[in-house]
């Protein structure tokens, strides 16, 4: 399974093409749109979310509510594009029109300046348009397809925010994936501790009044994962490594950890390793899950627990200093629409990319042309694992 996305932030549409989804997977536009709505939600979101109400359109690969095995093409129309027809025109236009909304003041922390240098742009909007987090719309759409596949294999996935701008959220112990999903969905800030809800919302309001932004940490948890996804035989086949790449590829994500993560560096080995248990009912399990569901780059049957750290959104309403690329004079950075935080939305993107990598790994291990064969192969593997 592989995919590509295309489109600009203020272009006419966003597109994704997925190849490798088995035939026979039940799939509707609403399956995708539900996740797109969640990506646009969350406390503190700003103007763009009021303009766009994302709806996906299938143009190939789905017929009568089921996948056909052909490449799946999905489009999302950018409604805001009508205000940008000249600025984002694919055809050559007059110089006076080209200068409208031209960007020469790069924003610190964005791709603006480095993209301009790399691709030799005199208008940094070319960098901004593709590097914008608007692109993650289609990664969420791709992830929604992947999640439908995982659900057919009795795997479940959820995300929630565990740190908001330095404020750690207390997470009750032993929550199931379903409980995490339910609690986070009921929260405007995607946390599982309702007692902290108003405190976090007040904090976001204060950050907005200050013209500043905050980052934080998002956790994704996956249950029902088969044993043995990934491999130790080559460095690039380790599944946790593939997931790490996917997570830090998300806009503004700067770090990733599994299970205890960096805390493991402060503990003794006897306090980190997960003891192995066996029972006739459950087969092999672990007493703890400090390693986040991985051993040797492979899934061990425990829930996958992965966290990603998101830096504060770099577009500030009190902009930092920058330099004009034409005059080299100091200027305040360009201000585009921005939010004080996008952590709840980022959680949806992280959930999507994790689901996508897991779907790719499932289809690599249990290669199947249709859903029925895939389900049979996974069920057979689970029986084998339990009786090993």
UniProtKB/Swiss-Prot annotation:
Per UniProt, where does NADP(+) bind?
39, 45
Q: At which positions is FMN bound? A: 130-132, 251-252, 296, 311-315, 337
Uppermost EC category: lyase
Give one Pfam hit by family name. Answer: Chorismate_synt
Can you name a GO cellular component term?
A: cytosol
InterPro entries tied to this protein: Chorismate_synth (IPR000453), Chorismate_synth_AroC_sf (IPR035904), Chorismate_synthase_CS (IPR020541)
Q: Which Gene Ontology terms describe the biological processes this protein takes part in?
A: amino acid biosynthetic process; aromatic amino acid family biosynthetic process; chorismate biosynthetic process
> Could you tell me the EC number(s) of this protein?
4.2.3.5
Pathway(s) annotated for this protein in UniProt:
Metabolic intermediate biosynthesis; chorismate biosynthesis; chorismate from D-erythrose 4-phosphate and phosphoenolpyruvate: step 7/7
Q: Which cofactor does it need?
A: FMNH2
Q: Which family does it belong to?
A: Belongs to the chorismate synthase family.
State the PROSITE patterns in the record. CHORISMATE_SYNTHASE_1 (PS00787), CHORISMATE_SYNTHASE_2 (PS00788), CHORISMATE_SYNTHASE_3 (PS00789)
Q: Which PANTHER family match?
A: CHORISMATE SYNTHASE (PTHR21085:SF0)
- Keyword entries, A-Z: Amino-acid biosynthesis, Aromatic amino acid biosynthesis, FAD, Flavoprotein, FMN, Lyase, NADP
- Cross-referenced CDD domains, in alphabetical order? Chorismate_synthase
The role this protein plays is:
This reaction introduces a second double bond into the aromatic ring system.
Record note on cofactor: Reduced FMN (FMNH(2)).
**By its UniProt entry, which HAMAP family does this protein fall under?**
Chorismate_synth
Q: Which domain of life is it from?
A: Bacteria
What's the subunit arrangement here? Answer: Homotetramer.
Q: Name one GO molecular function term.
A: chorismate synthase activity
Q: Which reaction(s) are listed as its catalytic activity?
A: 5-O-(1-carboxyvinyl)-3-phosphoshikimate = chorismate + phosphate
Provide the protein name: Chorismate synthase
